[in-house]
């Protein structure tokens, strides 16, 4: 069905595509233990899925990606929001409605990026490795609002310029109606003047699955279909890679390495010629860094349990290649960029960046004002630079008011205008101190 589709006519809600893979990414954010993962479970049912196959399991669990199909009942009389239902991504396209038994239509296939602890979250959000189109902000009704991380996450969303947010007031089953009303007022006060100001606020109980159908209706109605350009050169950021061969397999049965990641732009098809950059990085006799891109061909594509003929941006995609499996084993390719041959951006060893520092450290509570303030960049200090899904060290060579020159410890495939996150080592932890835009850099001859 998908082979003879015309790429220019595809859209992220084309039935042939959403029946097999997710096309919209939604992040779940909020304070610790406010129920982010529980909401994802309530919508996608994913914690109950025992994957048929280790492959997908490796990919989806570590990062907390879960896909869900959202259906709407075809019967006009069926009362909303009960006419919306969600199932896991291997459900058929027209299941019967549980209320009136009419067939339901698949309207969206979404992928939830379930963000873990906030420090990591900040880096992933800024990295754009989680290409989020929208966010669910969770606020628990049985604690006062705002909790410290709730406000940081809002700051992070503002940096990322995410416009579409749905606020979920969780755990309403634990509080009285009057308390819920007061808490609702405190949420309104908290979001005033931020990006989330006019966002809908839905009272829910993720454990009891109360009002989950209302969230689905908002996801379908409030979150616009992201504009995706399927005609540009494809690019995928690798976040997992592995060797799928069992020890002792026959030589003829060996399979190539598998890379998993999210596609940023374009479309990947079976049998495409691809290139992976920076590839194999070595040093020559003079100590200069060389890199050798890896060339290969796509032999399989899959999303959760579904084999694909073509893969579009959204959710996590596994790409089976002809690459030597030892190059892929145990996440060796993480942070590399995969794309069509000859169309990938340059590999840089030095970056000139235009940087912005946060006013104070996030997530550090301390009585002393000075410790939480972010100090200016110093010459020769070593920062951690997150580019896409690569984390590499960077030594600050030169600093001006808002510009800095950074020498990377490992070459990175990036392009001018890309956003990177900067972290500094504070009390034995890497802490996010700001973000930057790549202005120019020194490229490696590949």
UniProtKB/Swiss-Prot annotation:
Gene Ontology CC annotations of this record: cytoplasm; cytosol; eukaryotic translation initiation factor 2 complex
Region of interest (Interacts with cdc123), residue spans: 436-446
Binding annotation for GTP: 33-38, 170-173, 205-207
Swiss-Prot/TrEMBL keywords: Cytoplasm, GTP-binding, Hydrolase, Initiation factor, Nucleotide-binding, Protein biosynthesis
The keyword Cytoplasm is annotated on this UniProt entry: yes
Keyword Cytoplasm annotated: yes
Domain tr-type G: 21-227
Positions of the UniProt region annotated as G4: 170-173
UniProt EC number: 3.6.5.3
Subunit organization: Eukaryotic translation initiation factor 2 eIF2 is a heterotrimeric complex composed of an alpha, a beta and a gamma subunit. The factors eIF-1, eIF-2, eIF-3, TIF5/eIF-5 and methionyl-tRNAi form a multifactor complex (MFC) that may bind to the 40S ribosome. Interacts with cdc123; the interaction is direct.
Reported function: As a subunit of eukaryotic initiation factor 2 eIF2, involved in the early steps of protein synthesis. In the presence of GTP, eIF-2 forms a ternary complex with initiator tRNA Met-tRNAi and then recruits the 40S ribosomal complex and initiation factors eIF-1, eIF-1A and eIF-3 to form the 43S pre-initiation complex (43S PIC), a step that determines the rate of protein translation. The 43S PIC binds to mRNA and scans downstream to the initiation codon, where it forms a 48S initiation complex by codon-anticodon base pairing.
Descriptive protein name: Eukaryotic translation initiation factor 2 subunit gamma
Protein encoded by which gene: tif213
């Amino acid at each position: 069905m998908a082979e003879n589709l015309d790429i220019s006519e595809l859209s992220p809600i084309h039935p042939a595509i959403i029946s097999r893979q997710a096309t919209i990414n939604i992040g779940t954010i909020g304070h610790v233990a406010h129920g982010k993962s529980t909401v994802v479970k309530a919508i996608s049912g994913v914690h109950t899925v025992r994957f048929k196959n280790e492959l997908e399991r490796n990919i989806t669990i570590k990062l907390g990606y879960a896909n869900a199909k959202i259906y709407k009942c075809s019967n006009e009389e069926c009362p909303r929001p009960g006419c919306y239902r969600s199932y896991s991504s291997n459900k058929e396209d027209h299941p019967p409605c549980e209320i009136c038994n009419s067939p339901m239509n698949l309207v969206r296939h979404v992928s939830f990026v379930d963000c873990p602890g906030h420090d990591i979250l900040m880096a992933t959000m800024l990295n754009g490795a989680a290409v989020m189109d929208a966010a669910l902000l969770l606020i628990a009704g049985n604690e006062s609002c705002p909790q410290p991380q709730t406000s940081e996450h809002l700051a992070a969303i503002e940096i990322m310029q995410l416009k579409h947010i749905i606020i979920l007031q969780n755990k309403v089953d634990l509080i009285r109606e009057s308390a819920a009303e007061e808490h609702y007022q405190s949420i309104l006060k908290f979001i005033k003047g931020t990006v989330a100001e006019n966002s809908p606020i839905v009272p829910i109980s993720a454990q009891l699955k109360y009002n989950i159908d209302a969230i689905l209706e908002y996801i379908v109605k409030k979150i616009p279909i992201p504009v995706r350009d399927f005609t540009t050169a494809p690019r995928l950021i690798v976040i997992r890679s592995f060797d799928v061969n069992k020890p002792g397999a026959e030589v003829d049965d060996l399979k190539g390495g598998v890379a998993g990641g999210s596609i940023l732009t374009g479309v990947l098809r079976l049998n495409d010629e691809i290139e992976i950059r920076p590839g194999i990085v070595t040093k020559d006799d003079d100590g200069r860094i060389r890199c050798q891109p890896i060339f290969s061909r796509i032999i399989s594509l899959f999303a959760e349990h579904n084999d694909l003929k073509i893969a579009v941006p959204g959710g996590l995609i596994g790409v089976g290649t002809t690459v030597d499996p030892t190059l892929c084993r145990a996440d060796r390719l993480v942070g590399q960029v995969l794309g069509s041959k000859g169309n990938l951006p340059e590999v840089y060893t030095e970056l000139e960046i235009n940087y912005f520092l946060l006013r104070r450290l996030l997530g550090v509570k301390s009585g002393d004002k000075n410790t939480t303030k972010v100090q200016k960049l110093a010459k020769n200090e070593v920062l951690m630079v997150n580019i896409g899904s690569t984390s590499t060290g960077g030594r600050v060579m030169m600093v001006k008011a808002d510009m800095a020159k950074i020498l990377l410890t490992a070459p990175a495939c990036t392009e001018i205008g890309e956003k990177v996150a900067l972290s500094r080592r504070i009390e034995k932890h890497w802490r996010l101190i700001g973000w930057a835009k790549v202005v120019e850099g020194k490229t490696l001859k590949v």
